[in-house]
Curated annotation (Swiss-Prot):
Pfam families named in the record: MutS_I, MutS_II, MutS_III, MutS_IV, MutS_V
Protein name per the record: DNA mismatch repair protein MutS
Protein species of origin: Streptococcus sanguinis (strain SK36)
GO cellular component: a single term: cytosol
Keywords in alphabetical order: ATP-binding, DNA damage, DNA repair, DNA-binding, Nucleotide-binding
Length: 849
């Protein structure tokens, strides 16, 4: 259809739509939001709503779909959850007063990273990330638009950037145009992120300060620009950007956090079965968010850790006070989110009452902590600001029975505003006047069933049935005729109605004005509310630590400056909670100054992986400031944890199990220090036996000679146990088994020395393989053992000269005159390249063959 034939309303739609080509445009028309053209077609499919058309009789009808205004939020949620943007175009004037087309403007763009209203409120953070890049350095900024949290850092490695984005569970990333195309493809393709672009950076001195580097300032500025561009309002709740360094926390990449089930179970994707699930005895949404953050970022500063431990100890020593505290915390609402709604101008009366109720609980919480009388609680007590001015204003102004909707009246309490009270008096007296008038006219007219009714169309009226029409007084005038009755008015009734309607309208308008003033006044306290929220969250998390310590029988760990780690009867607290304390077998571990590496052998399913994860979880809990699951625990402060636990291909990136193993091993070898913890489980199983064994041994030797990190290395290569003879800082341990009458029992107990068998056939039996197959396997095993075809003699040890292998793997890099293509291939640093970069490089080399 030609543009000139469009109606003014459709032309207005197209004019607005061209400014938001990447968003669904919800175009307000009366009581509906309408969508047109491709937006309508696509939205109808996603939202499962009817697709109709505008101008159905035209040659090219315009596709149209719509959703009701009052229930639009649930449809917006579906679109945003599906990864789309939604632009909201509102009517900016009353259609009854409009001259021509009703003026409409986009008032907000809702995106996956900027959701502030939702029909399904969630206590989790929703982070929006911005990136900037120059000369090998990345600036990364992130923000939660609801809580106002705003953090900025610099990173030198794109892998770290991806890991940080994954840790934040971000769904949208804001970019300039400087990021390499291959890296953009990784973000959009492999990580399935929505990419949004801005060219300019907002330089807000108040929010950005002077401490940020130029790259960080660019990233943070682009984030602010995008947020202001989409939200189109003042965002007074945003906190000042805080610089952080990942090296200031216990470093763990995304794969490590996933393999350790820190915030969700890797298999189910649910909270159940994670460390977060175990540790979460918080009573507030703010506490839940802070707990998740502490789990993701354990500390490396012993003083800060001790501060948290001291508070936990105080709470453990004061059971009754802690019980009172938890009860008080149950009455605390999510004031971070409430403060953001104040800032957005979206707070309703019920939410202001929730704010006042929370502030009303603060003095009681403060009194409980003061009553304990511990100096370790001083900082928390100081941060408990009850903001009495705001609490008093809301409590005196807002009616306890106030509705959610701010235009329906009955919001403001009687006695708060004298003028409003006068209007309400007129309404109350008017009701009495109408009742008196009804009695008077019934007596004067002799109509026994005469009564006064009301509806929106006719207002107040006398209701007279047809049988009584002959008795209608002469001063009655007809207002409406029905089948069995008629409706009449009088001058006196009209006067009373006029006074009441005027009072009702003025009362509603005045209530709205008063409420808006109160909401504006509340906006002045946003920073104090946010500071209070942080203190309440910390109190909540620390009481949660105490509750878990009590329930799970945890102990306070001790940190030592020596490189000595000793845990007596340690437990994997999550596994223990799932299994039950009676079923779990604790294990001790000692890695002193003379022992850096434990080489763990034993059958599959015997508990090697649990033993390794147990140590990592204890370290993480300790450096969070929590107590730990052990009889006693003494350990050094670690700067990083590196893991390779569990075998799974990275199908999204097109990387095999072995490639993933090698890349994770490479990260550990390159980045670990002697203050790190390395956990490698069955490294090398993804390739040929000799290759895997050779690589496993070389990696162990490298860690032993050059890294010095505390390391647990589980392996099925029993030949590697000979390394204990040549590597002075390595010791063998194994998982004990009990073999009796042909039956094998896994004891799940770690004992010194190497394992003598792998019991693979027994594991296969447990898995339910056919009996004939198992008998054949046992026969083959007996034959191999009688031939003594062990592989140990084929592997060089650190002190033994290398011997030629009988079955040598073909080399890609043969000696002699070398093809220049092979030279280029060898020089590729594939472990620091993305899969797409590797593919592109190989494609270029292929052209040269």
């Amino acid at each position: 259809m030609a543009v000139e034939k469009l109606s003014p309303g459709m032309q207005q739609y197209l004019d607005i739509k061209k400014d938001y080509p990447d968003a669904f445009l919800l175009f307000r028309m009366g009581d509906f939001y309408e969508l047109f053209y491709d937006d309508a077609v696509n939205a109808a499919q996603i939202l499962e709503i009817s697709l109709t058309s505008r101008n159905k009789n035209a040659e090219n009808p315009i596709p149209m779909a719509g959703v009701p205004y009052h229930s639009a939020q649930q449809y917006i949620d579906v679109l945003v959850e599906s990864g789309y943007k939604v632009a909201i175009a509102e009517q900016m004037e009353d259609p009854k007063e409009a001259k021509g087309v009703v003026k409409r403007e986009v008032v907000q763009v809702i995106t996956p990273g900027t959701v502030v209203d939702s029909s399904k409120p969630d206590s989790a953070n929703n982070f929006l990330v911005a990136l900037d890049y120059s000369d090998g350095l990345y600036g990364l900024a992130y923000m939660d638009l609801v809580t106002g949290e705003f953090q900025v850092t610099s990173l030198e490695d794109f892998a770290l950037v991806c890991g940080e984005i994954r840790n934040l569970k971000a769904r949208e990333v804001v970019l300039g145009y400087a990021l390499p195309e291959a890296e953009e493809q990784v973000l959009a393709g492999q990580m399935n992120l929505l990419l949004s672009y801005v060219q300019t950076a907002l330089d807000d001195v108040q929010l950005l300060g002077e401490e940020l580097s130029p790259m960080e300032r660019q990233a943070a500025g682009k984030l602010l620009e995008y947020v202001h561009r989409t939200q189109m309002r003042e965002l007074s709740h945003l906190k000042k950007a805080q610089h952080y360094e990942i090296k200031d926390f216990l470093q763990m990449d995304y794969a490590t956090k996933a393999s350790l089930d820190l915030t969700e179970n890797a298999r189910s994707g649910k909270k159940h079965g994670s460390l977060y699930w175990l540790m979460d005895e918080t009573k507030t949404a703010m506490g839940g968010r802070m707990l998740r953050s502490w789990i993701q970022r354990p500390l490396i500063d012993e003083a800060r850790i001790s501060q948290r431990q001291n508070v936990v100890e105080v709470f453990l020593d004061h059971f009754f006070e802690r019980s009172d505290l938890t009860e008080s915390l149950k009455g605390v609402y999510d004031i971070e989110r409430l403060a953001s709604r104040v800032s957005f101008g979206k707070t309703n009366p019920k939410e202001l009452l929730q704010l006042a109720a929370t502030l009303g609980n603060v003095p009681q919480i403060k009194a409980i902590l003061q009553g304990i009388g511990s100096p370790h609680l001083a900082r928390l007590i100081e941060g408990l600001d009850p903001i009495p001015e705001l609490a008093g204003l809301i409590s005196s102004a807002i009616s306890p029975d106030a509705p959610h909707i701010i235009t329906e009246g009955n919001i403001i309490q009687t006695g708060f505003d004298e003028t409003l009270d006068q209007y309400r008096l007129v309404l109350r007296e008017g009701t009495g006047w109408i009742a008196e008038l009804e009695v008077k006219e019934r007596a004067n007219s002799g109509i026994s069933n005469l009564k006064i009714d009301y509806n929106k169309k006719d207002g107040y009226y006398f209701h007279v049935t047809n049988s009584q029409l002959a008795h209608v007084p002469s001063h009655f005038f007809r207002k409406a005729t029905l089948k069995n009755s008629e409706r009449f008015g009088t001058e006196e009734l009209a006067r009373i109605e006029g006074e009441m309607l005027e009072a009702r309208e003025k009362s509603a308008n005045l209530e709205y004005e008063i409420f808006m003033r109160i909401r504006e006044e509340a906006g002045k306290y946003i920073q104090r509310l946010q500071a209070l929220a942080q203190t309440l969250a910390a109190v909540d998390v620390l009481q949660s630590f105490a509750a878990v310590a009590e329930q799970q029988h945890l102990v306070r760990p001790v940190f030592t400056a020596e490189r000595r780690l000793q845990i007596e009867k340690g437990r994997h607290a999550v596994v223990e909670k799932v299994m039950g304390a009676q079923s779990y077998i604790p294990n001790s571990i000692l890695l002193d100054q003379e022992t850096d590496i434990q080489l763990i052998t034993g059958p599959n399913m015997s508990g090697k992986s649990t033993y390794m994860r147990q140590l990592a979880i204890i370290v993480i809990m300790a450096q969070m400031g929590s107590y730990v699951p052990a009889q006693s625990a003494s350990l050094p402060l670690f700067d990083a944890i590196f893991t390779r636990i569990g075998a799974a291909d990275d199908l999204v990136s097109g990387q095999s199990t072995f490639m993933v193993e090698m890349m994770e091993a490479n990260r550990a070898i390159r980045q670990a220090s002697e203050r790190s913890l390395i956990l490698f489980d069955e490294l090398g199983r993804g390739t040929a036996t000799y290759d895997g064994m050779a690589l496993a041994q070389a990696i162990i030797e490298h860690i032993h000679h050059y890294t010095g990190a505390k390391t647990l290395f589980a392996t099925h290569y029993h030949e590697l146990t000979a390394l204990e003879e040549s590597l002075e800082h390595l010791e063998n341990v194994h998982v004990a088994t009990l073999e009796k009458d042909g039956q094998v029992t896994f004891l799940h107990k770690i004992e010194p020395g190497p394992a003598d068998k792998s019991y693979g056939i027994h594991v296969a039996k447990i898995a339910g393989l056919p009996e004939k197959l198992l008998e054949r396997a046992d026969s083959i095993l007996s034959h191999l053992e009688s031939q003594d075809t062990g592989l140990g003699s084929e592997l060089p040890t650190a002190s033994r000269p290398k011997q030629s292998q009988v079955a040598e793997q073909m080399s890609l890099f043969a000696e002699g005159t070398e093809n220049p293509v092979l030279t280029e291939l060898r020089d590729l640093d594939i472990y620091n390249m993305t899969p797409l970069e590797v593919m592109a490089a190989v494609a270029e080399l292929k052209k040269k063959l």
